Amino acid sequence: MSSQEEIVIVDATNQILGRMSTHIAKLLKSGKKVYVVNAEKAIISGPRSRVLEGYSLLFTVKTMQNPYRQGIRRPRNPINIVKRTVRGMLPKNKLGKQIYRNLKAYIGIPKELEGKSMIRFDDADVSRLKGKYITVAELSRLLGGLKQ
């Protein structure tokens, strides 16, 4: 990588999480650093009950080695939900781990990123949806991640 890496700031407000994540994964694969701001305002399409059921499905699963101590770790806060979604779209090898380190997500807009130009993806806008949806912040509250 060059000494002057290109930084891309993505505003996740009213962006569909899956579609936004595909664009972020492509940017990361091209060697850019990506900062996602307003991660809690991203949108997941589908009725609230179905989305919650899908995310909470693996909370009760235990491992065979020590079922009392370990289970499958699932993200509960908005930052980790967004990062985990992008991680699933990256290569599953050493290169994928290195690429994943160039991704940062924030709740709100941090002071050092205020006033800088942010990009939004037109094909990931919530106006595409005709049905129901839930925000990542609302999902996080229902999973026990946000205390508001």
UniProtKB/Swiss-Prot annotation:
Any single biological process term in GO: negative regulation of translation
Subunit structure: Part of the 50S ribosomal subunit.
Gene Ontology cellular-component annotations: cytosolic large ribosomal subunit
Keywords: Ribonucleoprotein, Ribosomal protein
Species whose genome carries this gene: Sulfolobus acidocaldarius (strain ATCC 33909 / DSM 639 / JCM 8929 / NBRC 15157 / NCIMB 11770)
Entry similarity comment: Belongs to the universal ribosomal protein uL13 family.
NCBIfam families: L13_A_E, PRK06394.1
Summary of the function given for this chain in its UniProt record: This protein is one of the early assembly proteins of the 50S ribosomal subunit, although it is not seen to bind rRNA by itself. It is important during the early stages of 50S assembly.
HAMAP family the UniProt entry points to: Ribosomal_uL13
Protein name, entry field: Large ribosomal subunit protein uL13
Lineage summary: Archaea, Thermoproteota, Thermoprotei, Sulfolobales, Sulfolobaceae
Magnesium among keywords: no
Pfam families found in the cross-reference section: Ribosomal_L13
Gene Ontology MF annotations: mRNA binding; structural constituent of ribosome
